[in-house]
């Protein structure tokens, strides 16, 4: 830990109210003031931390996390508190300068986000919701985005997004579920219009349930509907003539339909796909036609036509023609 200067002053009574003043210089230039009733039940407190600047490197391979002009207010007691946080944060390679404005209430095993506002790169995000970890983990969160640039957080997907996403879920040692009932996003990706709308549900019982999910990216349209699990019935409708820009180092065309039925571990697959100029990282495929069906149980059988030209994966696999 880098050297820091610390100045602490205490006054008052340990049996009634203890007033404190703490000043630090070095890693964190900050002042903490307030009072605490140490002898009372739940320890009532009223604290304020003002930090002009501070930074700390959590790992040698990452840029340090930096904060500036942070004001934190904490009132209530250890079992029922109210927190307000305002300030700036940046660093760790992928966090642009972001203004944070938090208003929250909490108890020993839960926290309620009355409002969390983030502003960065000319965009904003507003989150409200709650989380509880008394018995496993539970959450209920809604995010509203307005021209939010996610490229610093997901470098492979340089998108600017507006709209709403909501999620509820829970997890413990035996069960888990994640419900995303609302996905309604619009914006741009790699200078092309983008929209993603629908809902998704995942759980330990049914791995994936998609009532409907539609991605539009430029002239590309990818729709998914159905379930994956012990009784899979998932339909994919892909009309993607130009995938370039959807993800880093992805290019090519995929058009057609696919269906997955039955047990996920031994599925029946029906497919009719045409692929052209596909490239992703170390994989290249000039052209392919995949049509037919494959049944996995009780034994693998079916009728599948595969025609491909110039398939290459890295330097280890090269095939000129597959028929």
Regions inferred by a protein language model and the residue ranges of each:
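Glycine-rich phosphate-binding "P-loop"
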Residues: 1
């Amino acid at each position: 830990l880098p050297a820091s200067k610390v100045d602490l002053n205490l006054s008052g009574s340990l049996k009634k109210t203890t007033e404190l003043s703490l000043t630090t210089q070095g890693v964190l230039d900050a002042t903490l003031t307030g009072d605490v009733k140490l002898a009372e039940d739940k320890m009532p407190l009223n604290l304020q931390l003002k930090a002009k600047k501070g930074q700390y490197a959590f790992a040698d391979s990452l840029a340090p996390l930096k904060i500036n002009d942070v004001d934190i207010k904490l009132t209530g007691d250890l079992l029922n508190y109210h927190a307000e946080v305002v300030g700036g944060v940046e660093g760790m390679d992928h966090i642009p300068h972001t203004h944070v404005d938090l208003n929250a209430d909490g108890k020993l095993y839960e926290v309620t986000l009355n409002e969390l506002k983030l502003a960065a790169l000319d965009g904003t995000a507003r989150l409200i919701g709650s989380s509880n970890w008394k018995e496993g983990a539970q959450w209920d969160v809604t995010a509203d985005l307005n021209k939010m640039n996610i490229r610093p957080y997901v470098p492979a997907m340089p998108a600017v997004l507006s709209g709403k996403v909501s999620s509820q879920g829970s997890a413990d040692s035996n069960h888990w579920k994640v419900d995303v009932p609302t996905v309604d996003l619009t914006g741009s990706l790699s200078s092309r219009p983008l929209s993603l709308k629908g809902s998704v549900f995942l759980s330990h019982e049914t791995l994936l349930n998609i009532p409907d999910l539609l991605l539009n990216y430029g002239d590309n349209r990818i729709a998914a509907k159905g379930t994956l699990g012990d009784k899979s019935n998932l339909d994919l409708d892909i009309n993607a003539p130009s995938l370039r820009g959807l993800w880093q180092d992805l290019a090519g065309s995929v058009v057609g339909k696919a269906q997955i039925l039955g047990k996920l571990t031994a599925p029946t697959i029906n497919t009719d796909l045409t692929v052209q100029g596909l490239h992703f990282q170390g994989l290249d495929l000039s052209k392919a036609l995949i049509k037919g069906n494959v049944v996995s149980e009780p034994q693998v059988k079916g009728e599948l036509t595969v025609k491909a030209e110039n398939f290459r994966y890295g330097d280890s696999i090269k095939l000129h023609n597959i028929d």
